[in-house]
């Protein structure tokens, strides 16, 4: 299907009256959106929910216009941001001056240069976290994938987030709290037009988890105020900025940004690494090639940062993983001024949604899009992709600043586990996606790790 990507407002969006199939949409919104996206074939879509009629842009040219070319017109605002604004406040997850200030303060912590300086300590943390998998592996015990990936990610990123300024008991409270926030916000995220006065499933659990998270984070801020310290971690950068940037920054601002970075640094990586194991289980040829590359480069050693540049297939596997299961599955924007997208007039105040998950599965953009094929990201083929055919970290000024940490961490964790074990996933065929703040497997997933070498 040819798609008009011009800017002359002469067309109408493809309309889908979701209010007619609302119960089906609520039961499985991801499947409904996939169906709609496939039928539209890249045309701009109007989702008619009755109370709300947002547009949905999936064609790479339309996405590029919204996220990059007209990023100053399409802003983070409107009802689709209400659940996140209530959670993250005036942080890097916001817009305008609040976002610019937070980004300016946090950007140095996530620079490529600084991330490289952290690689040795992160590799040590990953190897130590993977060490604890040896006991259940040699005992033949199954592990729950998502909690174990969360534990490994948490133990890796905690130094980047807090340096040495957090106690183990405090860190242990934050992990389940973030897990509960991520799962309980799902209905508010999907149904943002429902007033807060009308209770939805998850509201009570969300409030309890948020209260616990806030209590812990404010304790950390209070302690830093009483005994300031040095460091190049996120927490220190925020606390020092609060003291030097003026009276406009308070404890609430520090808390908002801490919670934002906690969610983006841990939740997204955990979920992505949860998906990789059922995918590899269903694609033994990919798993075999991965193991061969890792064995040739790493052998029986502990994984080090210098190994990664010699593991190109590991990088391709992570890239293809993010094509099928991007860390951010949808990005809402609202138009400040009239414009047009794909020839469709957009009024000021209209909401336009862009979805990496849906763009990454368009047949007009990707050949056989549901097939897991890391060769799509070989050097020869990767350069042929449209810039916005693949945008798992968003795009334009709001592209995720933590993407370098994610890539390094994900590649190291995958390599470390596969250098020691052969994972066997139980019921990998049951790994069905469910959307909320991120795209998680609907059902609990377990796997057994078969040791590649005998216990020492």
Per-range role (PLM):
Residues 2-35, 39, 51-53, 61-64, ...:
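Cytochrome P450 catalytic-domain helical core, especially the substrate-recognition surface
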Residues 3, 37, 126, 130, ...:
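Cytochrome P450 proximal C-terminal region
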Residues 21, 111, 209-273, 287, ...:
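Conserved cytochrome P450 catalytic core segment spanning the I/J/K helices
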Residues 21-41, 215, 301-342:
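Conserved cytochrome P450 K-helix E-x-x-R motif and the immediately C-terminal K′/meander segment
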Residues 268-293, 404-419:
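Cytochrome P450 catalytic-core helices
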Residues 354-381:
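Conserved cytochrome P450 K-helix/beta-meander segment immediately N-terminal to the heme-binding cysteine loop
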